[in-house]
């Protein structure tokens, strides 16, 4: 009988730990489409880190997952609260300076700026809001369609791709 009780206690503790980790630390996610290709492809399995959101550690270039209605999307942060941003002739400008990152140059996006957002009064991103963009220019499931992404809708940043094994990646570089 003591073995059964010990087993049940161990099982309950394991379930509590798993629930805690999935609620506050990390969660698994399957990439549902090719919006972030070639960085992430449909069917890739990733770990989403929730801690960076909790402690306001999200950075430009981070790939995040976020909720929009009942759907979960994956995009890249291109501008954070307190910054301005614009695309001019395929080049991303942040705070009126060109961004030197692979995701920011030679894009098929000609002219796109904060002025495209109806919900925004000025040229600066308000607190707790982000501008996100997919790596695929023709897939507009990002700020071009949704507008600003509120921090409360962000699940976390993609910090590890564990499948397919041949593409194992930790911390995606911009």
Swiss-Prot record:
SUPFAM superfamilies: LexA/Signal peptidase (SSF51306). GO terms for molecular function: serine-type endopeptidase activity. Pfam families: Peptidase_S26 (PF10502). Residues 29-174 are extracellular. The chain crosses the membrane at residues 8-28. InterPro entries: LexA/Signal_pep-like_sf, Pept_S26A_signal_pept_1, Peptidase_S26. GO terms for biological process: signal peptide processing. PANTHER family: CHLOROPLAST PROCESSING PEPTIDASE (PTHR43390:SF1), SIGNAL PEPTIDASE I (PTHR43390). Belongs to the peptidase S26 family. This is Inactive signal peptidase IA. It comes from Staphylococcus aureus (strain COL). The gene is spsA.
């Amino acid at each position: 009988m003591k073995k059964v009780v010990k087993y049940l206690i161990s099982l309950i503790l394991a379930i509590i730990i798993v629930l805690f980790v999935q609620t506050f630390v990390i969660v698994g996610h399957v990439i549902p489409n090719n919006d972030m290709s070639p960085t992430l492809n449909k069917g890739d399995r990733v770990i989403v880190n929730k801690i960076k959101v909790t402690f306001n550690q999200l950075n430009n270039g981070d790939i995040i997952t976020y909720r929009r209605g009942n759907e979960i999307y994956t995009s890249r942060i291109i501008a954070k609260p307190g910054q301005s941003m614009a695309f001019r002739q395929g080049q991303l400008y942040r705070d009126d300076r060109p961004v030197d990152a692979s995701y920011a140059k030679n894009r098929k996006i000609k002219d796109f700026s904060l002025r495209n957002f109806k919900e925004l009064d000025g040229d600066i991103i308000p607190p707790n809001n982000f501008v996100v963009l997919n790596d695929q220019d023709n897939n507009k499931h990002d700020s071009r369609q949704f507008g600003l992404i509120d921090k409360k809708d962000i699940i976390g940043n993609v910090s590890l791709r564990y499948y397919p094994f041949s593409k194992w990646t930790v911390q995606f570089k911009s």
